[in-house]
């Protein structure tokens, strides 16, 4: 995962012993967030079946901190969009995203969510990044559970390295404004 070294320091005044280390609050918050992501599956086709396998005992996504699958956007911070999204479904997906509290992350699982897949028609959204910002793309049609786990692990690395203040930065606000999200 991370190759950061632990900075061992001498104990604070008045204390004796070994094993004291110094870190930044940013690192602690990043580690806590990365290992406690609550997924919200938004599945419309076969990628959802692969996600079910990912949550089952053999692959067990809970080992990576995603113990509690939420079916309420208000209680989730990781949106997994799986499958074909029609243009009529796009406003609903966007509404689900907007109902999630900050910080929130999005994983586009499979070819359909990433680029429309084989459905290059007038009624299919050609990638969910047309309506919401995406943090990680998982390729495949459908992707194997191992690939979904890898996508979650990549998101964890992104979350760990993200500054506590990034979500309130002008750059992030500009990104949301480009999607007309306040």
Swiss-Prot record:
Gene3D superfamilies, sorted: 3.40.50.12280
Note on cofactor: Binds 1 [4Fe-4S] cluster.
Subunit and interaction comment: NDH-1 is composed of 14 different subunits. Subunits NuoB, C, D, E, F, and G constitute the peripheral sector of the complex.
Cofactor requirement: [4Fe-4S] cluster
Organism lineage string: Bacteria, Pseudomonadati, Bacteroidota, Flavobacteriia, Flavobacteriales
Keywords noted in UniProt: 4Fe-4S, Cell inner membrane, Cell membrane, Iron, Iron-sulfur, Membrane, Metal-binding, NAD, Quinone, Translocase, Transport
Keyword field contains Transport: yes
This protein's encoding gene: nuoB
Reaction(s) the record says it catalyses: a quinone + NADH + 5 H(+)(in) = a quinol + NAD(+) + 4 H(+)(out)
InterPro entries according to UniProt: NADH_UbQ_OxRdtase-like_20kDa, NADH_UQ_OxRdtase_20Kd_su
Signal peptide segment: none
PROSITE patterns: COMPLEX1_20K (PS01150)
Membrane-topology annotation of the record: Peripheral membrane protein
Subcellular location: Cell inner membrane
Chief location bin: membrane
Annotated function: NDH-1 shuttles electrons from NADH, via FMN and iron-sulfur (Fe-S) centers, to quinones in the respiratory chain. The immediate electron acceptor for the enzyme in this species is believed to be a menaquinone. Couples the redox reaction to proton translocation (for every two electrons transferred, four hydrogen ions are translocated across the cytoplasmic membrane), and thus conserves the redox energy in a proton gradient.
GO BP, sorted A to Z: aerobic respiration; electron transport coupled proton transport
Binding residues annotated for [4Fe-4S] cluster, in chain numbering: 46-47, 112, 141
GO molecular function (one): NADH:ubiquinone reductase (non-electrogenic) activity
GO-annotated cellular components: plasma membrane; respiratory chain complex I
A Pfam family: Oxidored_q6
PANTHER family: NADH DEHYDROGENASE (PTHR11995), NADH DEHYDROGENASE [UBIQUINONE] IRON-SULFUR PROTEIN 7, MITOCHONDRIAL (PTHR11995:SF14)
SUPFAM superfamilies: HydA/Nqo6-like
Domain of life from the UniProt record: Bacteria
Name used for this protein in its record: NADH-quinone oxidoreductase subunit B
Family statement drawn from the similarity comment of this UniProt entry: Belongs to the complex I 20 kDa subunit family.
């Amino acid at each position: 995962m991370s190759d950061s070294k632990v900075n061992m320091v001498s104990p604070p005044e008045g204390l004796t012993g070994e094993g004291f280390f110094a870190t930044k609050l940013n690192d602690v918050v990043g580690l806590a967030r990365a290992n406690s992501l609550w997924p919200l599956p938004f599945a419309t086709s076969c990628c959802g079946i692969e996600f079910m396998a990912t949550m089952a005992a053999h692959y067990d996504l809970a080992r990576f901190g995603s113990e509690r699958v939420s079916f309420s956007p208000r209680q989730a911070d990781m949106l997994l969009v799986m499958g074909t999204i029609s243009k009529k479904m796009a406003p609903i997906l966007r509404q689900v995203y907007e109902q999630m509290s900050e910080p929130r992350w999005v994983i586009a699982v499979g070819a359909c969510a990433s680029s429309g897949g084989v459905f290059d028609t007038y009624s299919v959204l050609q990638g969910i990044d047309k309506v919401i910002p995406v943090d990680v793309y998982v390729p495949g049609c459908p992707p194997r559970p191992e690939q979904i786990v890898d996508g979650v692990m990549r998101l964890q690395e992104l979350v760990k390295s993200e500054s506590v203040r990034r979500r309130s930065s002008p750059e992030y606000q500009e990104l949301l404004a480009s999607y007309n999200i306040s």
